[in-house]
Amino acid sequence: MIVGTAGHIDHGKTSLLRALTGIEGDRRPAERQRGITIDLGYLYADLGDGSPTGFIDVPGHERFVHNMLAGASGIDCVLLVVAADDGLMPQTREHLAIVELLGIRRALVALTKIDRVEPQRVQQVRTQVEHLLASGPLARSPIFPLSSSTGEGVEALREALGGLAGEVRERSREGYFRLAVDRAFSVAGSGIVVTGTAFSGQVAVGDELLLGNAGRPVRVRGLHAQNRPAQQAWAGQRVALNIAGERLALEQIQRGDWLLQAALHAPTTRVDIDFRLLPDELRDFIHWTPVHLHLGTQDVTGRLALLEGEQLEPGHRAFAQLVLNAPIQALHGDRLVLRDQSAQRTLGGGRVLDGAAPARNRRTPARLAQLQALRQESLEEALPTLLGAAENGLDPQRLVQSFNRPREHWRLPEEVVEVQTRLGPRLFAGERWFALVEQLLAGLRRFHEELPDELGPDRDRLRRYALPQLERPVFIALL
């Protein structure tokens, strides 16, 4: 299990983790000097179930929300920290909104610094927290009043975390491996090490992977999973990979890179999403507004084009297309957060629907029908509508990449027809394919009726006459 903290600056997140685990997280000299968390901290502890639980300590200051977002991606549970003396503060609310946008549905609340206030104040803040959570997906999350200084209440929270670790289901190992890089450093005698959370699949020593948007080939020389040496690691674990590659330099690796198998490598600058504007926003969201995108550990600027109108009211959702200033890696179902142009305010977020979004015809009824189908969680649920709207069939390799579903894990309906073209296989609904055959024959008959003295048309002329909308390789396969 991976637990991430959330909460306002100076509410005691780092102190609480130290009290829970007895371990001081990774901290920079500047953090020790200033007494605040600036970047992400990592530590591991056995909570009693025999396996290490990973903790990610995130900064609470509003200037470092981008670091908090990098740490929150891929966690199983959030530990929301609220100080009893301060109560709810701006970053409490923003961190909670981010956690909900990222789809995190397990939370424990630590009500810290109770040794500094009267019992009435503790109850007052507890009620505030309950009201804050009541309308969202984390309603009825347990609240633990405690003091990291005296130790009061810490054991109860530790036991609750241990119990939760037993409830968290191991993530599926199906799919290709990908890891969101949050750190890279050099170890004497070993070379370059990258760390991050494994989002999908599994990896083993000796595997070949691609690094970053450039797709630089690297080999896994060694690895740690949940801070322990291992031969394999898989989705849902914190992983450190010792990697090597031709002319690979530490300066070429940065937070935001992905380390993944070749089948998933598809950098993109256009992503269609299911976007939700936070209800606390004071004004409508306007089409083509500049935004900051946070996905995994990536942080990229761009603009958001609304696909169903020119503006969106607070609390509402709509299809939208991100047009980015730099390429990213994005798969169907990935959770994302959008902040304003100055990165001062969280606007909303949502899910990736299509990581290879079209630049043209993005608002047509047919395209919106495809996006409606892509709101489904699984490939099997989305496939019937996608097939019905695909004039030239579906590229199965693109579906493999978009849904991270290797072909051996597919369950295609019997009526689906797979056609081999010069560009590779295409999938058609059987009804659609046989309708194309009829259109082809009808076009050929019409040609001979209208031009009885001419010889039969050549291939390209027949395509223009009968099925001009069909791509040439698909038409050749139809013949």
Where are the regions a protein language model picked out?
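Residue-level signature of catalytic and energy-coupling elements of molecular machines
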Residues: 10, 16, 35, 57, ...
